[in-house]
Amino acid sequence: MCHIIVRADSDINSVHDLLGKTVSVGEEESGSQLNAKQILSAYGLNEKMVKEENFNYADSAKALVSGEVDALFWTVGINATVVEELSRQCDIKLLSIDKEVSDKLKSAYSYIDCKVDGNTYNGQTKDVNTVGVKSVLIVSDRLSNDKVKALTKLVFDNANELQLTVSADLDIIEKDAVTGVNIPFHSGAAEYYSEKGIEVKTAE
């Protein structure tokens, strides 16, 4: 899930307001950087219009607290520890992504709509609309159908146990798991989904 964070006392209230600002977009070649650039571009902003810094999580947090950067982009799960820790170092607010822009991002890159409920983080009282990306389990096409089918079944059969290992809502449901995935599914996984009444595209 994409978190766009500014200090609570900032005059930045939308992504449009990042024009001319200094923004930590994440480390080079990271998922956060890719998402940040795509979101900024969807708002018509490029590196000539926004000064980009490639800080890691820790340095991004320090830079926001000190005022070295005006905003930061983090692609992390809901209830992320790094965001919670940052919210205890300084008062923060999260920026929403406008529906028109989120629709554009979903069409171009298969993002999904996400919402950060109010009071998820310290001092964040309002709901925030943003976008997110899927985490996908990748397997070799050399694995047998039986093994991949069994692995897929194992994930969904143990969804409740997996949920207990993290604070974020994993929402492990078959029909949702295949939405927005643009790479081919292994034939073994396709067999599992087919038995659940869900058809997916394979490489074959």
Predicted region positions:
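An extracytoplasmic/periplasmic, membrane-proximal ligand-sensing/linker region
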Residues: 55, 59, 65-66, 76-94, ...
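Generic signal for short, ordered secondary-structure residues
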Residues: 43, 130, 171-172
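Residue-level detector of anion-binding/catalytic polar loops
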Residues: 22-24, 70, 199
